[in-house]
């Protein structure tokens, strides 16, 4: 049994965007306020090779596995691995489909992602997801100008899950870590098109989250700079100075959920777009 304040890994595996899984899992996780889910979202898993990469991550960080996969072989392989490593797994749409089949007397078409109308909005979301996954954690900084939003922040300010959440809303989102002693990518200094949002949290909150992260990985919570109070405080101050220097929007995420953070960013983006249209 998990104790108050502890973390568990939650793996969400989908052959489509993963939005259904995210919505359902967060609605349930919200009922357990004293424990925190470390989300691992795997959208567009449609081949054995893609699934193998997912299974490797699940094996490295066992936890609850929820999935929306329609391909029988992929389902069987996922369930077998989860059973092998004693990770509970559940198909979110499986029981619902069984109920429909029993009532309608007909089987499903088996079309992956059939719940999504193939319109411009759908393809926009897929494009945003692909972009965000390619530009996670400071990767491919040469493509930052193509983003709608660029998130920056020190470690454990929820940059990646916020990026994925925004991408599920069709917003191309990149994120770049701010690391003490490492210069920021020069591309960040000259961005024109994207909204750059600097995510901040209190040193106390960061230390708590980082300690729990280390414990979840089986690492000791020593006095290294990652969780040292003075070092973390210096990180926060440096991030604020960079934000002021480059005119990035500041957003305190200390007491915000991912949904609340994303909503605030979407409002900033909408306000910015309205301002530009009026100029």
From Swiss-Prot:
The keyword DNA-binding does not apply. Its EC number is 2.7.11.32, 2.7.4.27. InterPro entries: Kinase-pyrophosphorylase, PPDK_reg. One of its GO terms (molecular function) is ADP binding. It holds the Pfam family Kinase-PPPase. Keywords: Kinase, Nucleotide-binding, Serine/threonine-protein kinase, Transferase. Signal peptide: none annotated. ADP binds at residues 153-160. It catalyses: N(tele)-phospho-L-histidyl/L-threonyl-[pyruvate, phosphate dikinase] + ADP = N(tele)-phospho-L-histidyl/O-phospho-L-threonyl-[pyruvate, phosphate dikinase] + AMP + H(+); N(tele)-phospho-L-histidyl/O-phospho-L-threonyl-[pyruvate, phosphate dikinase] + phosphate + H(+) = N(tele)-phospho-L-histidyl/L-threonyl-[pyruvate, phosphate dikinase] + diphosphate. Belongs to the pyruvate, phosphate/water dikinase regulatory protein family. PDRP subfamily. Bifunctional serine/threonine kinase and phosphorylase involved in the regulation of the pyruvate, phosphate dikinase (PPDK) by catalyzing its phosphorylation/dephosphorylation. This is Putative pyruvate, phosphate dikinase regulatory protein. It comes from Rhodopseudomonas palustris (strain HaA2).
């Amino acid at each position: 049994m998990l104790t108050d304040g502890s973390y568990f890994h939650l793996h969400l595996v989908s052959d489509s965007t993963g939005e259904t899984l995210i919505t359902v899992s967060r609605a349930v996780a919200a009922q357990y306020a004293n424990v925190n889910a470390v989300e691992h979202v795997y959208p567009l898993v449609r081949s054995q090779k893609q699934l193998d990469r997912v299974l490797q991550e699940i094996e490295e960080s066992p936890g609850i596995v929820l999935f929306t996969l329609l391909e029988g072989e992929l389902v069987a392989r996922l369930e077998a691995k989860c059973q092998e490593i004693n990770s509970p797994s559940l198909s979110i749409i499986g029981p619902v489909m069984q109920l429909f089949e029993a009532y309608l007397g007909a089987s499903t078409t088996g079309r992956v992602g059939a719940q999504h109308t193939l319109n411009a909005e759908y393809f926009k979301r897929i494009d945003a997801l692909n972009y965000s996954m390619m530009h996670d954690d400071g990767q491919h900084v040469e493509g930052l100008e193509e983003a709608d939003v660029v998130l920056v922040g020190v470690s454990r300010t929820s940059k990646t899950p916020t990026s994925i959440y925004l991408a599920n809303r069709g917003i191309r989102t990149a994120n770049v870590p701010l690391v003490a002693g490492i210069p920021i990518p020069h591309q960040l200094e000259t961005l024109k098109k994207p909204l750059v949002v600097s995510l901040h949290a209190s040193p106390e909150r960061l230390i708590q989250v980082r300690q729990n992260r280390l414990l979840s990985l089986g690492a000791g919570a020593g006095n290294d700079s990652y969780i040292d109070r003075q070092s973390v405080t210096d990180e926060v101050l440096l991030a604020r100075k960079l934000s002021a220097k480059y005119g990035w929007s500041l957003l305190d995420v200390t007491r915000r959920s991912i949904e609340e953070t994303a909503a605030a960013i979407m409002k900033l983006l909408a306000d910015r777009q309205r301002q530009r249209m009026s100029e």
